From Swiss-Prot:
Extracellular side: 1-47, 108-121, 186-212, 275-304
Intracellular or extracellular location(s): Cell membrane
Transmembrane segments: 48-68, 87-107, 122-142, 165-185, 213-233, 254-274, 305-325
Protein name: C-X-C chemokine receptor type 3-2
Species in which this protein is naturally found: Danio rerio (Zebrafish)
Glycosylation sites per record: 3, 19
UniProt superkingdom: Eukaryota
Cytoplasmic side stretches: 69-86, 143-164, 234-253, 326-378
Family from the record: Belongs to the G-protein coupled receptor 1 family.
GO biological process annotation, one example: immune response
Function as written in the Swiss-Prot or TrEMBL entry: Receptor for the C-X-C chemokines cxcl11.1 and cxcl11.6. Promotes macrophage chemotaxis to sites of bacterial infection.
UniProt keyword annotation of Repeat present: no
S-S bonds: 120-199
Molecular function terms, GO-annotated: C-C chemokine binding; C-C chemokine receptor activity
C-alpha cells in the first residue's frame, strides 16, 4: 500500500487517498488497485457516522457540563469537589471539542474542504488534541477510583482537587504538543482528476513512511495501550476489593466496572489493530495486496467511527450512572420545566427503589466524605 492510501494517519480523522487507483511503491510495474468502490462506500458512510456521533456527543456532554455547573454554583472554591468530578469535567470538555470537529470532516466527505488552509490545520490539531486527552482523562478517573476504594487515600489529600487541576493542565499541555504534528503537516491537497480539495497530513516525501509508522506507534501507545493498562490494573484491584460485597449497589458497581473496560476495548481495539496491520504492511512484514488495501481503507474508517462514538458514550458511562448525578439532573429539569414536567426523570433519578432511600457514596472505608459527586461508584 502506498503511503497515503491507508486511512490510518495517526492523529486526525481518517486521511484517505482519494485517487481512483493505488500503486505499490515497491513494485511500480504492478497493476493498479481500483479504489472507486471503496471511495463510494466511504463517501456515504463517513458523513452519516460523523454527524450521528456529533449530535449524541453534543447532547450528552452539554448535559454533563450543565449539571456540573449547577453543582459548582453552590460552592465558592474552584477546589470544592472531588478529584473524579474534576477529571469528569475535563473529559466532557475534551469530548465536546472533539465532537465539534466532526461536522467539518463530514462536509469534506460530502463535497470538499471549503474552510481554508488555516482551519484545516486548526481542526486537525483540535481533533488530535482531544482524542489523546479523552483517553488519558479516562485513565485518570480509574486511577482516582483505585486510590479511593482500594487504598482509601487520606480524605484531606483527595479533597484538594487543585491537585487534579494541575494533573489535567499537564495532560492538556502534553497532548497539545502531540497535536502540533497536525498543525505543522496538515495541508490542502487537490484530488487528481476530480477538482476537489481535501485536508490531509502531508509528510515530506523522503521520510513519509518513517513519520507515518512513528506517529502511529506513538498514537497506539498513548491513545490506547497505556490507558488500557492503567484501567485494567485499577479496575481489577477495585473488582477484587468489591467482589465479596453483599450490598446490591456494590454488586451493581462490579457490573459497571466490567462494562467500562469492555466498552473501551470494543471502541478502540479494532481501530488500533488495523492500524498496527497497516504499519506492518508498510514495513514489509505483511505482503501488500489490493484486497488488503481495501480492507484496511474501509476497516480503519469504520472502526475509527466506532472509537469516536466513545465520546458520546462517556456521559452515560461516567455521569448518568451516578445516583447523585441523576438527582442533580432531575433538579435542573424541575427548575426548567416544573415538577409536573419531570415526573419520570425524578423517578429514574431516585433509582428503582424507594425515592426516600438515602444516597450512598463511594464504596470505600471513607464512604461519606470521599464520595465523588458524579462518581461511577455513587
Amino acid at each position: 500500500m502506498d503511503n497515503s492510501t491507508t486511512a490510518a494517519e495517526v492523529s486526525a480523522p481518517t486521511d484517505y487517498d482519494y485517487n481512483s487507483t493505488s500503486y505499490d511503491d515497491d513494485n511500480p510495474y504492478a497493476a493498479p488497485c481500483s479504489l472507486t468502490e471503496t471511495w463510494n462506500f466511504l463517501g456515504r458512510f463517513a458523513p452519516v457516522a460523523y454527524i450521528l456521533v456529533f449530535i449524541l456527543a453534543l447532547v450528552g456532554n452539554i448535559l454533563v457540563l450543565c449539571v456540573i455547573r449547577r453543582y459548582r454554583q453552590s460552592r465558592h472554591s474552584p477546589c470544592s469537589f472531588s478529584l473524579t468530578d474534576t477529571f469528569l469535567l475535563h473529559l466532557a470538555v475534551s469530548d465536546l471539542l472533539l465532537a465539534a470537529t466532526l461536522p467539518f470532516f463530514a462536509v469534506e466527505w460530502i463535497s470538499e474542504w471549503v474552510f481554508g488552509k488555516v482551519m484545516c490545520k486548526i481542526t486537525g490539531a483540535l481533533f488530535s488534541l482531544n482524542v489523546y486527552c479523552g483517553v488519558l482523562f479516562l485513565a485518570c478517573i480509574s486511577f482516582d477510583r483505585y486510590l479511593a476504594i482500594v487504598h482509601a487515600i487520606n480524605i484531606s489529600w483527595r479533597r484538594k482537587t487543585c491537585h487534579a487541576q494541575l494533573a489535567c493542565a499537564f495532560i492538556w499541555v502534553i497532548c497539545l504538543g502531540l497535536s502540533m504534528v497536525d498543525m505543522h503537516f496538515r495541508d490542502l491537497v487537490e484530488i487528481p482528476g476530480m477538482n476537489r480539495m481535501v485536508c490531509q497530513i502531508v509528510y515530506s516525501e523522503q521520510y513519509s513512511k518513517q513519520w507515518q509508522i512513528g506517529m502511529q506507534l506513538v498514537s497506539m501507545v498513548l491513545g490506547f495501550i497505556l490507558p488500557l493498562l492503567v484501567m485494567l490494573y485499577c479496575y481489577l484491584h477495585i473488582f477484587k476489593a468489591l467482589c465479596h460485597a453483599t450490598r446490591r449497589q456494590k454488586r451493581r458497581s462490579l457490573r459497571l466496572i466490567i462494562s467500562l473496560v469492555i466498552v473501551f476495548v470494543i471502541s478502540w481495539a479494532p481501530y488500533n489493530a488495523l492500524r498496527m496491520t497497516d504499519s506492518l504492511q508498510m514495513l514489509g512484514v505483511i505482503v501488500k495486496s489490493c484486497a488488503l488495501n481495501n480492507v484496511l481503507d474501509v476497516g480503519i474508517l469504520v472502526t475509527e467511527s466506532l472509537g469516536l462514538a466513545h465520546c458520546a458514550l462517556n456521559p452515560l458511562l461516567y455521569g448518568l450512572v451516578g445516583v447523585k448525578f441523576r438527582r442533580e439532573l432531575a433538579q435542573m429539569c424541575k427548575a426548567a420545566l416544573g415538577p409536573q414536567g419531570c415526573l419520570g426523570l425524578v423517578g429514574w433519578a431516585n433509582g428503582r427503589g424507594s425515592s426516600t432511600r438515602r444516597p450512598t457514596g463511594s464504596f470505600s472505608s471513607v464512604e461519606t466524605e470521599n464520595t465523588s459527586y458524579f462518581s461511577v461508584m455513587a
